[in-house]
């Protein structure tokens, strides 16, 4: 496992604010250099994973993780941004991503006794659900097991920017989501 620096759980670094534009520039350069305009779905998926690997090669994983998922201030609210996640999510680091989310949850539980998760899923698609299927299923099995500490201390999961086809995406994973968890999911129209 890579050292990702859990000492500071909240996002406050000015460098993190610049990270998004640097990632965007790298993705643009990658797209131009690798001629990623192919239309085959499997090719596009491979190219997205290759681009994610390129982002991982150029940026510190800890910075990427802290930009993707963080605790806002001194609160018990964990924010997860899919728009950042998708820029670097690669099967080689799925365990590290899960470790980061678990560490944030445990920090909130130890500090506040409870926690909430806020997830921005803007631009999440059915193909993204398929691409990250292994990670999503692992998240459900590790983090959202019935009667686990993480479930017992979870107040709500707020979902922001749900795509129109979100119900279709939810059906894909509905067998893995416990009824107790489903009752804690709240869809919010505005973004965080």
Feature roles, as predicted:
Residues 1-156, 160, 164-192:
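SEC14/CRAL-TRIO lipid-binding/transfer domains and related phosphoinositide-recognition modules
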């Amino acid at each position: 496992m890579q050292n990702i620096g859990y000492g500071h759980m909240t996002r406050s670094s000015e460098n993190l604010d610049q990270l998004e534009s640097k990632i965007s520039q790298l993705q643009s350069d990658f797209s131009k250099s690798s001629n990623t305009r192919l239309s085959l779905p499997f090719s596009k998926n491979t190219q997205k994973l290759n681009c994610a690997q390129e982002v991982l090669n150029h940026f510190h994983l800890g910075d990427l993780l802290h930009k993707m998922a963080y605790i806002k201030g001194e609160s018990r609210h964990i924010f997860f941004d899919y728009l950042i996640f998708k820029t670097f999510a690669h099967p080689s680091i799925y365990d590290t991503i899960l470790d980061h989310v678990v560490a944030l949850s445990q920090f909130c539980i130890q500090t506040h006794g409870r926690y909430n998760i806020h997830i921005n899923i803007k631009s999440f698609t059915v193909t993204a659900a398929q691409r990250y299927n292994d990670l999503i299923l692992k998240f459900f099995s590790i983090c959202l097991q019935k009667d686990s500490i993480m479930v017992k201390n979870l107040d709500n999961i707020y979902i922001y920017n749900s795509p129109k086809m979100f119900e279709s995406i939810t059906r894909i994973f509905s067998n893995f989501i416990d009824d107790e968890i489903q009752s804690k999911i709240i869809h919010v129209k505005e973004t965080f």
